[in-house]
From Swiss-Prot:
Record localization: Host nucleus
GO BP terms, alphabetized: DNA replication
Protein name (database record): Para-Rep C1
Motif (Nuclear localization signal): 56-77
Residue span of motif RCR-1: 7-10
Domain (CRESS-DNA virus Rep endonuclease): residue spans on this chain: 1-99
Gene this chain is encoded by: C1
Catalytic activity: ATP + H2O = ADP + phosphate + H(+)
Keywords, in A-Z order: ATP-binding, Covalent protein-DNA linkage, DNA replication, DNA-binding, Endonuclease, Helicase, Host nucleus, Hydrolase, Metal-binding, Multifunctional enzyme, Nuclease, Nucleotide-binding, Nucleotidyltransferase, Transferase
Organism: Faba bean necrotic yellows C11 alphasatellite
Record: active site: Y86
GO terms for MF: ATP binding; ATP hydrolysis activity; DNA binding; endonuclease activity; metal ion binding; nucleotidyltransferase activity; RNA binding; RNA helicase activity
Taxonomic lineage: Viruses, Viruses incertae sedis, Alphasatellitidae, Nanoalphasatellitinae
Length: 282
């Protein structure tokens, strides 16, 4: 039986094996793709749990020929959002495109933009701006590189493996520059993290409120070190805040998240409680 929508499971041993499989999925051939990383509780076997919505119908034999014979494939049930929730219940690994509810015209708008960006720019510049931003983000998040972790990055990775709480702020400190802080912070975007360089509190809260269950990375430039926004950090970490810019909304979020600050300066103990901070030195 042929279908456009499939879910898959792939057991793997190495990160290279995992990324090689993910790289087979082409943005030009699909509407939406998402996969997460899971570990079987009884065997500790690592595996990818994924979902793909293709632009064209394909049979099981065609999938195996295109993506190899190791993955297990089944026709997907539920919509894009339900499959995304299922695939990312542990860790989001890769996402291409955006989930769309049944009957929505969101994907049609993006398709129109991709067919003729210049025409949409003339007719509806605001929509064209958002579509282009989405396109660039998709391209950025679908690129992968094998990174050799520095000691501090390995330490940070171990800390992130623990469940987040509603208090701890992880502070990555390196005064020299060139230690890989921004490189690590930008890589987190590909795993669904909210990335910000700081700024005014309401600007940060407004951007975060668009999807308020994301982990958070503050990548603070050296020139902004004297204007560190501790208020926004604590409000986001506390999971209760009001975003009053443009579309006012009060948010009370149950899901706890990690919050990392990448900075060239150490935290100021007069502006934030020291017991909240876990420092990782570069």
């Amino acid at each position: 039986m042929a279908s456009k929508r499939w879910c898959f499971t792939l057991n793997y041993k190495t990160a290279v094996e995992r990324e090689s499989f993910i790289s087979l999925f082409s943005r030009d051939e699909l509407n939406y793709f998402v996969c997460g990383d899971e570990t079987a509780p009884t065997t500790n076997q690592k595996h990818l749990q994924g979902y793909v919505s293709l632009k064209k119908m394909i049979r099981l034999g065609g999938l195996k020929k295109k993506f190899g014979y190791r993955a297990h494939w089944e026709i997907a049930k539920g919509d894009d959002f339900q499959n995304r929730d299922y695939c990312t219940k542990e860790t989001l690994i890769s996402e291409i495109g955006a989930p769309v509810k049944k009957g929505s015209n969101q994907r049609k708008i993006m398709d129109l933009y991709l067919q003729d960006p210049e025409e949409m720019q003339l007719k509806d510049p605001d929509t064209a701006l958002r579509c282009n931003a989405k396109r660039l983000r998709i391209e950025y998040c679908s690129s992968f590189a094998v990174i050799s972790l520095r000691p501090w990055q390995s330490e940070l990775h171990r800390v992130l493996m623990a469940e987040p709480d509603d208090r701890t702020i992880i502070w990555v400190y390196g005064s020299d520059g060139g230690e890989g802080k921004s490189t690590f912070a930008k890589e987190l975007i590909k795993y669904g993290w909210f990335y910000t360089a700081g700024g005014k509190t309401q600007d940060i809260l407004y951007m975060y409120a668009q999807d308020p269950e994301r982990n958070i990375a503050f990548d603070v430039p050296r020139c902004s070190s004297e204007m560190m926004n501790y208020q926004a950090m604590e409000m986001l970490k506390n999971r209760v805040f009001a975003s009053t810019k443009y579309r006012p909304v009060d948010l009370c979020v149950r899901k706890k998240v990690h919050l990392i600050v990448f900075a060239n300066v150490s935290p100021d103990p007069t502006k934030i409680s020291e017991d909240r901070i876990v420092i990782i030195n570069c």
